[in-house]
Amino acid sequence: MKKGAVGIGTLIVFIAMVLVAAVAAAVLINTSGYLQQKSQATGRQTTQEVASGIKVTRVVGKADSATNPTYIQELAVYITPNAGSSGIDLTKVRITLSDGQKQAIFKYRVGNSANELYFLAELMQNLGATIKFDNGSVQVYFDPTDWTSAAPTVIIDTTNKVIEIVNATVDSNDNHIKPATDSNVTISFDTPVSLYAFANPVSDVFDNDAFNNLTTKTDFGIAVLQDSDGSLDNKEYPTLTKGDLVVLALRVGGTQSLGYSSGVSKISVISTTTTDVLTKQSSVNVTITWTAVFGNGFDTGTKVTGKVIPEFGAPGIIEFTTPSTYTQQVIELQ
């Protein structure tokens, strides 16, 4: 009996050991499978990070005058993807630029931010530009110098397509939108338009919508020079792929004035009553005027550094020193 009990006990221990080994083996198999998948994913990500990226092939500047050039005010940054790079979403690209005194970060305006409900509200809230609304007989102005104490609170109503400027009025003397305590100003739209700083195809690198449609001082535009597979056809989602060549358009100095036919239908002052100051006739034209981040632009002998930074992968490098004299308007800088 004792020997039988010992045998049964040994068998139980043996079975338990087999079960433990089986469980351990299952855990090891699952763990190894998980680690293998993780390592593969990490490898793909690492390969993507190493192989992908942007190469800056050249930088060309345009000065303020053909006869007496003094400041570089526009930059055309030529980029192409690195060899072996996967597609690069240009809406996620950021450009950093510094002249040693200031540093600016530029982005491509796309989607809702390209809609005038959003960029007009942004410009007013940030005091970023002078804005003129003109229906052909009446002009209404938003001027940042009228808001010296504080920037206005601006509310966007996308459902009713209205921008509301809180605690504001339209001065009857000069038709400027100014601070007030007992009224709001509403800017109503039929169909808000969208503006894209995008050009495809391009005949003149510096005279196209990539430069002309820049709506704020921290925008960059996209001018397509070469696109064999159509990956850059969609201005909402331009993607840089193998063989593509693109110019990123930046205004770095001087004043930009952008005029366009707007979707604005009326501008009203709302207090105890509603007064329509401007109503749409055939159309309402809007003119946006702003000064670039670097003031007049880059003077002679200025060292400029920066990067073109994709969402993943290696950034393209911008580094040049402007010439000691400007002898022509368009100048190769890098």
UniProtKB/Swiss-Prot annotation:
Record-stated family: Belongs to the archaeal flagellin family.
GO biological process, one term: archaeal or bacterial-type flagellum-dependent cell motility
Keyword Ion transport annotated: no
Record keyword Ribonucleoprotein present: no
Described function: Flagellin is the subunit protein which polymerizes to form the filaments of archaeal flagella.
Keywords: Archaeal flagellum
InterPro entries: Flagellin/pilin_N_arc, Flagellin_arc
Organism expressing this protein natively: Pyrococcus horikoshii (strain ATCC 700860 / DSM 12428 / JCM 9974 / NBRC 100139 / OT-3)
PANTHER family with a match to the protein in the record: FLAGELLIN B1
The protein's name: Probable flagellin PH0549
Signal peptide: none
GO cellular component: archaeal-type flagellum
One Pfam entry name: Arch_flagellin
Location relative to the cell: Archaeal flagellum
GO molecular function: structural molecule activity
